[in-house]
Curated annotation (Swiss-Prot):
Mn(2+) 1 binds at D274, D351, E353. It comes from Vibrio parahaemolyticus serotype O3:K6 (strain RIMD 2210633). This is Probable cytosol aminopeptidase. Pfam families: Peptidase_M17, Peptidase_M17_N. GO terms for molecular function: manganese ion binding; metalloaminopeptidase activity. Mn(2+) 2 binds at K269, D274, D292, E353. The keyword Cytoplasm applies. One of its GO terms (biological process) is proteolysis. The keyword Chloroplast does not apply. Its cofactor is Mn(2+). Belongs to the peptidase M17 family. Its EC number is 3.4.11.1, 3.4.11.10. It catalyses: Release of an N-terminal amino acid, Xaa-|-Yaa-, in which Xaa is preferably Leu, but may be other amino acids including Pro although not Arg or Lys, and Yaa may be Pro. Amino acid amides and methyl esters are also readily hydrolyzed, but rates on arylamides are exceedingly low; Release of an N-terminal amino acid, preferentially leucine, but not glutamic or aspartic acids.
Length: 502
């Protein structure tokens, strides 16, 4: 689909369809009022008749409105004007795109980007409209023998902005939105892949493919033999029960003209399937453990978006691929592992495996002398209990970095919330036999997991994002969400000095 931005009056638009908002109860938006005036009250007369109340998501398609050059006008219910928020705005955009496709529109000029959304500017509204549109059109049906027919005639969508001086901001928003949407799609596709296809070797193949597609990207794959030489015993232990080889994919993007500029490092947990190992998970819902690699998938999607945007920064993405299976060679509760850092860990539960993979990955990235390191992982069920399915958790050893990430989450509407990491929580990780245990009990489970990782991130500024509650959805809408790609790309946009606010 082609996106563009323009600034013009609705009555002068020669398009297949004009999209304008109507507020509850039956109140025309300023743009709809202009059309109503041109049509001698035609639209307001329909509202008085009760054809549209203006409730969120209501749609009314009008044909041949008097005085209007466009063939059709789509009236979109936007709810109460003062209550139009971010979530409702994005839902309205998606419903609008769905209606345009269902009604056969090939092109449309959308004036919904002129609506007032609390605390948001033109850049945000246009970018979110692009992201919401692409996300709403996403499907994953490549494994269906008969592909469902979908009617999608819409080929061109123009977003109108109030003034000509906002055109450049709107164009930038489209560029950013398309790159982010591409990264989100890549992340969702990886997450939704079945685990008999998407194993660690598949992650590595996708990393290589990214390097083939973009000159600014190079890839290195580290297999078990090299991990053995590096002393990544903890990482290797997790994958011992699986016949699929553990592989760590290093994706390097160089965009900074200063070759000595320190890189930002993103590390993604890539458990392509997590059975729990010897500490086997319950059978119900275990199929969703294919999503335990969504941290790696989001890092991959972020690297793809970054390459598309060609930002002037250096970033390294690490996909820590592994599979946790029970087997005669699997690691056990009671085992003591010597990590790459030299610290020892007593395994109390083999289903707390993500941190055992990440700890060695965090030690490995020390060699890059990073500006900062951000790891992303579906790490703890405790985070779902703490924050639900709407907000990701952030823990960090560096206040400015934590602030940057939370700020980026607010800017992108891919929300995160910082959790504490006080010294007292480290007490729960004590072991009588090793330097630490791999779990600290049920209380504060997300925090103690963060405390565990922090022991391997002492040589750089570090943050951890727990996406256990936000990486995928269950039920009828089951599937990967692609989060937190939007947040991570916003963080990188900010780091590269890109202005994304008026």
């Amino acid at each position: 689909m082609e996106f563009s931005v323009k600034s013009g009056s609705p009555e002068k638009q020669r398009s297949a369809c004009i999209v304008v908002g109507v507020f509850e109860p039956r109140r025309l938006s300023p743009v709809a009022e202009q059309l109503d005036k041109i049509s001698d009250g035609y639209i307001s007369s329909l509202l008085r008749r009760g054809d549209l109340e203006g409730k969120p998501g209501q749609m009314l398609l009008l044909h041949q409105v008097p005085g209007v050059l466009s063939e059709r006008v789509l009236l979109v219910g936007c709810g109460k004007e003062r209550e139009l928020g971010e979530r409702q705005y994005k839902e309205i955009i998606q419903k609008t795109i769905s209606t345009l496709n269902e009604t056969g529109s090939m092109e449309a000029v959308c004036f919904l980007t002129e609506l007032h959304v609390k605390g948001r500017d033109t850049y945000w509204k246009v970018r979110q409209a692009v992201e919401a549109t692409k996300d709403g059109l996403y499907t994953f049906n490549q494994f269906k023998s008969v592909k469902p027919e979908t009617r999608r005639p819409l080929r061109k969508l123009v977003f109108n902005v109030p003034t000509r001086r906002e055109l450049s901001l709107g164009e930038k928003a489209i560029t950013h939105g398309l790159a982010i949407a591409s990264g989100v799609k890549a992340s969702k596709d990886l997450g939704n892949m079945p685990p008999n296809v998407a194993n660690p070797a598949y992650l590595a193949s996708q990393a290589r493919r990214l390097a083939d597609d973009y000159e600014s990207v190079t890839t290195k794959i580290i297999g078990e033999q090299e991990m053995e030489k590096l002393g990544m015993t903890s990482y290797l232990a997790v994958g011992r029960g699986s016949k699929n080889e553990s592989m760590m994919s290093i994706i390097e993007y160089k965009g900074n003209p200063d070759s000595d500029a320190k890189p930002i490092v993103l590390v993604g947990k890539g458990l392509t399937f997590d059975s729990g190992g010897i500490s086997l998970k319950p059978g119900e819902g275990m199929d969703e453990m294919k999503y335990d690699m969504c941290g790696a998938a989001s890092v991959f999607g972020t690297m793809k978006a970054l390459a598309k945007l060609n930002l002037p920064i250096n970033v390294i993405g690490v996909l820590a691929g592994c599979e946790n299976m029970p087997g005669s060679n699997a690691y056990r509760p009671g085992d003591i592992l010597t990590t790459m850092s030299g610290q020892t860990v007593e395994v109390l539960n083999t289903d707390a495996e993500g941190r055992l993979v990440l700890c060695d990955a965090l030690t490995y990235v020390e060699r890059f002398e990073p500006d900062c390191v951000v790891d992303v992982a579906t790490l703890t069920g405790a985070c779902v209990i703490a924050l639900g399915h709407h907000i990701s958790g952030v823990l960090s050893n560096h206040n400015p970095l934590a602030h940057e990430l939370v700020n980026a989450s607010e800017q992108s509407s891919d929300r995160a919330w910082r959790l504490p990491m006080a010294d007292e929580y480290h007490e729960q990780l004590k072991s009588p036999f090793a330097d630490m245990a791999n779990i600290g009990g049920r209380p504060g489970g997300t925090i103690t997991a963060g405390c565990f990782l922090s022991k391997f991130a002492k040589k750089y500024n570090w943050a951890h994002i727990d996406i256990a509650g936000t990486a995928w959805k269950s039920g009828a809408a089951k599937g990967s969400t692609g989060r937190p790609v939007s947040m991570l790309v916003q963080f990188l946009l900010n780091r590269s000095g890109q202005e994304t606010e008026e």
